Amino acid sequence: MKKIKVLCVDDSALVRGLMTEIINSHPDMEVVATAPDPLVARELIKKHNPDVLTLDVEMPRMDGLDFLEKLMRLRPMPVVMVSSLTERGGEITLRALELGAIDFVTKPKLGIRDGLIEYSEVIADKIRAASRARLRAPAPAGHAAPLRLRSPFASSEKLVIVGASTGGTEAIREVLQPLPADSPAILITQHMPAGFTRSFAQRLDALCAVTVREASDGERVLPGHVYLAPGGETHMRLGRSGANYVIGLQASEPVNRHRPSVDVLFHSAAEAAGGNAIGVILTGMGKDGAAGLLAMKRAGARTMAQDEASCVVFGMPREAIALGAADEVVPLADISERILTRLGDRGHRV
């Protein structure tokens, strides 16, 4: 079996050692070299031609973002960022994903050894996914011109429900940016740790015509608003309070190894919204959301999955398609327009 070759770049000797220990404990991957900074890494990339690079965000001599930008321009390769679990770390990591990084892992604030060892399987899964991922061009700057709804949107009954994981931050941006300000409400679960989703929501809000915010427990769901499930500590559910849709945040156990879980959101939308919803499953590894999308379809919702060619990781959409959960399989660049087309369709299903 050919092993995945990994180069670890981090200014901390402790983190380099722990990442090496974790990666080498899995039989399908190995650390071929480590580097304390990007300048050393540059020479080691030429020497070892690694399959995946793990890259610390903040380092001396050249920071991780500057190096990533140069790397993606001159020698694109799969990169997993290693980020601090802080608000600043979240903002920098989101920028790294815009520049082309595949995914990220977070360093615990305290007890780095125990924290990283605890997430050994998560780190290995992200490296495996990165080794198979499709590289994409960095995100263009600026705003996309909003599309128009094909028919005036007046009903607060209609909803769009979205789930994503690896590669999802950029896929979500591409879906939301063209949508007009009078779009129906949109609820999104993206696999992210605590502290990162607020920065993500703020970044999207600055780029989009719709209002994007991190969801709060008990708040009423309004048209023209996008609600992002808070990362790490709760699941987001859609519920009803009289004639209104409301958001519920529940601190229960992870589902499909994730909290928030896409399946939890999709199942709740099937029950609360039925045929008034559109369900969309985007790029990501694993199967979270596949069963929930099928539940939405059976409840009368229109459903779609991102196609393989445009996915960074074709995991969650593939599982949904295999279950028969997707009414249609759509390239990422066309999903916004397909959503608006479905919203303009007549009939009991949106």
UniProtKB/Swiss-Prot annotation:
Gene Ontology biological-process annotations: chemotaxis
Segments forming domain CheB-type methylesterase: 152-346
Span of domain Response regulatory: 5-122
4-aspartylphosphate carried by residues: 56
Positions annotated as active site in the UniProt record: 165, 191, 288
One Gene Ontology term of the molecular function aspect: protein-glutamine glutaminase activity
Modification note: Phosphorylated by CheA. Phosphorylation of the N-terminal regulatory domain activates the methylesterase activity.
InterPro entries given in the database record: CheB-like (IPR008248), CheB_C (IPR035909), CheY-like_superfamily (IPR011006), Sig_transdc_resp-reg_Me-estase (IPR000673), Sig_transdc_resp-reg_receiver (IPR001789)
EC number: 3.1.1.61, 3.5.1.44
Catalytic activity: [protein]-L-glutamate 5-O-methyl ester + H2O = L-glutamyl-[protein] + methanol + H(+); L-glutaminyl-[protein] + H2O = L-glutamyl-[protein] + NH4(+)
Compartment annotation: Cytoplasm
UniProt entry keywords in alphabetical sequence: Chemotaxis, Cytoplasm, Hydrolase, Phosphoprotein
Record's GO cellular component terms: cytoplasm
Main location: cytoplasm
Family: Belongs to the CheB family.
Recorded domain comment: Contains a C-terminal catalytic domain, and an N-terminal region which modulates catalytic activity.
PANTHER family: PROTEIN-GLUTAMATE METHYLESTERASE/PROTEIN-GLUTAMINE GLUTAMINASE, PROTEIN-GLUTAMATE METHYLESTERASE_PROTEIN-GLUTAMINE GLUTAMINASE
Annotated function: Involved in chemotaxis. Part of a chemotaxis signal transduction system that modulates chemotaxis in response to various stimuli. Catalyzes the demethylation of specific methylglutamate residues introduced into the chemoreceptors (methyl-accepting chemotaxis proteins or MCP) by CheR. Also mediates the irreversible deamidation of specific glutamine residues to glutamic acid.
Name used for this protein in its record: Protein-glutamate methylesterase/protein-glutamine glutaminase
Organism whose genome encodes this protein: Bordetella bronchiseptica (strain ATCC BAA-588 / NCTC 13252 / RB50) (Alcaligenes bronchisepticus)
Organism lineage string: Bacteria, Pseudomonadati, Pseudomonadota, Betaproteobacteria, Burkholderiales
Gene name of the encoded protein: cheB
